Design a protein with these regions (language model features):
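Active-site cofactor/substrate anionic-group-binding motifs, chiefly glycine-
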Residues: 12-54
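C-terminal ends of transmembrane helices
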Residues: 26-39, 59, 82-94
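Alpha-helical membrane segments in multi-pass integral membrane proteins
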Residues: 97-116, 122-146
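Cytoplasmic-side transmembrane-helix entry/capping segments in multi-pass membrane proteins
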Residues: 39-51, 70-76, 95-105, 128-129
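Small-residue-rich segments of transmembrane alpha-helices in multi-pass membrane proteins
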Residues: 46-59, 102-113, 161
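Juxtamembrane boundary at the C-terminal end of a transmembrane helix
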Residues: 178-189
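Structural signature of hydrophobic alpha-helical transmembrane segments
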Residues: 12-23, 46-47, 65-79, 128-133
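Single conserved hydrophobic/aromatic residue that forms the stacking wall/gate
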Residues: 1-6, 10-11
Length: 189
């Protein structure tokens, strides 16, 4: 019986890593190959990615109370909508923000990897605060970029690929903003 329990735990641990890392692999695949894929194939990969994110998100959400998840979701939705509208309507060119926001994103990734080993709540707080700022900025930046990409008169296939690419970017902005806000304002169980 102990052997079986150990095997089940090992399988669960492996499954947890697959569920957590598979969406990341699909994001890299879709980002790198979107121009080589047909729009319909890219869309199918995007839907598979979204489904896997739903499964992996369950692992995160069970750590928080339902009320705090709902509260943070509405805060995220309002913030995302406001920044997306601003990015779409502003006359200011946000292109210059791109490299700064990308550097911030790289910093968040590096700090998050370090914090896996360090386990510092202060570092996690800093990552979350900076993450909110970066993903708020990326929401406006990506929205304006998508608008500008669509301004060119492109064929239907290219527009389909741009739609998937844009949806992926905004989806990632929303999900990551939600996670950062949940780290800051979510009530743990």
């Amino acid at each position: 019986p102990l052997r079986l329990v150990g095997s089940e735990m090992c399988i669960r641990d492996r499954l947890k890593w697959v569920v957590m890392l598979a969406p990341l692999g699909l994001v890299f695949f879709l980002s790198a190959r979107i121009h080589a894929l047909k729009a319909s194939t890219a869309q199918a990969v995007f839907w598979i990615y979204a489904a896997l994110m739903g499964v992996s998100f369950a692992v995160i959400l069970i750590q928080f109370t339902g009320a705090s998840v709902a509260r943070v979701f509405f805060i995220t939705a309002g913030t995302f909508a406001a920044m997306s509208i601003w990015g779409y309507t502003t006359k200011k060119d946000l292109t210059g923000m791109g490299s700064f926001l990308f550097m911030g994103l790289i910093g968040i990734i590096i700090a998050s990897v370090v914090n896996i080993f360090v386990g510092s709540s202060a570092l996690q707080f800093g990552i979350s605060v900076i993450g909110v700022l970066v993903f708020v900025g990326l929401t406006a930046y990506d929205t304006q970029n998508i608008k500008n990409e669509y301004a060119g008169h492109l064929d239907d296939e290219t527009q389909g690929k741009l739609a998937i690419s844009g949806a992926l970017r905004l989806y990632l902005d929303f999900i990551n903003l939600f996670i950062m806000l949940l780290q800051l304002f979510g009530d743990r169980r």
